[in-house]
């Protein structure tokens, strides 16, 4: 398919954005668009400059016989902070308080545009880490983990609290649940879900006592895999927990006043490295 340079640059840009973290040979573009490799190389230089100027992401050129280009998506710090501030405002709405002091998050974590932006923000925060998979526990964390995995272009695995025959052989661990740590529960992961030696990013919607995350970390050990990091949408800072793992949060809930129907929410520690 022979294209004019302007058209060719559009389709190459679209390809890179939709195939992040994937090494693509320049020959692939040259053959597909019937252009000289030198012309494709010039296209990449222009696209790279534009992407970096508007902070869409970075293009890395890999030299050698097996070389090519790799696109790493990003988001500007200003855009990310504005998005998180908007989420903070939404989460502070008093009508989100549910019986028992829980917070309604489903509308936020089921909106594609919001999920896409959260995925970009979390992925950027871990862009220097080698990540092979994203892990979460069913069910509320699934859309969030999927969004992050899409940006990182890696698989995501779902840990379940109940055994399903469709999962095949599974590995299970016991974990402490409940804010007071007074319940022992079990979680399961299919043996086919995760390869040994994988570096895994754990993603969850809401961090309370930390028992669920600790359970997933225990599962990683059973699979001879390594924890690459923990990211949560919101952290309940009211909960007392023994710090057994580091994590990054977009939002931090500092107070839930059920009686007066008030929620105090701050921006989490996701941007601490920018300070």
UniProtKB/Swiss-Prot annotation:
The keyword DNA-binding applies. One of its GO terms (biological process) is negative regulation of DNA-templated transcription. InterPro entries: PRibTrfase_dom (IPR000836), PRTase-like (IPR029057), Pur/Pyrimidine_PRTase (IPR050118), PuR_N (IPR015265), PurR_Bsub (IPR010078), WH-like_DNA-bd_sf (IPR036388), WH_DNA-bd_sf (IPR036390). Residues 1-73 are annotated as: DNA binding domain. The keyword 4Fe-4S does not apply. SUPFAM superfamilies: PRTase-like (SSF53271), Winged helix' DNA-binding domain (SSF46785). GO terms for molecular function: DNA binding. Pfam families: Pribosyltran, PuR_N. Keywords: DNA-binding, Transcription, Transcription regulation. Residues 74-275 are annotated as: Effector binding domain. Contains an N-terminal DNA-binding winged helix-turn-helix domain and a C-terminal regulatory domain (or effector binding domain) resembling phosphoribosyltransferase (PRT) domain. However, the PRT domain lacks enzymatic activity and serves a purely regulatory role by binding effector molecules. Homodimer. PANTHER family: HYPOXANTHINE/GUANINE PHOSPHORIBOSYLTRANSFERASE (PTHR43864), PUR OPERON REPRESSOR (PTHR43864:SF2). Belongs to the purine/pyrimidine phosphoribosyltransferase family. PurR subfamily. This is Probable purine biosynthesis transcriptional regulator PurR. It comes from Streptococcus pneumoniae serotype 4 (strain ATCC BAA-334 / TIGR4). The lineage of its organism: Bacteria, Bacillati, Bacillota, Bacilli, Lactobacillales.
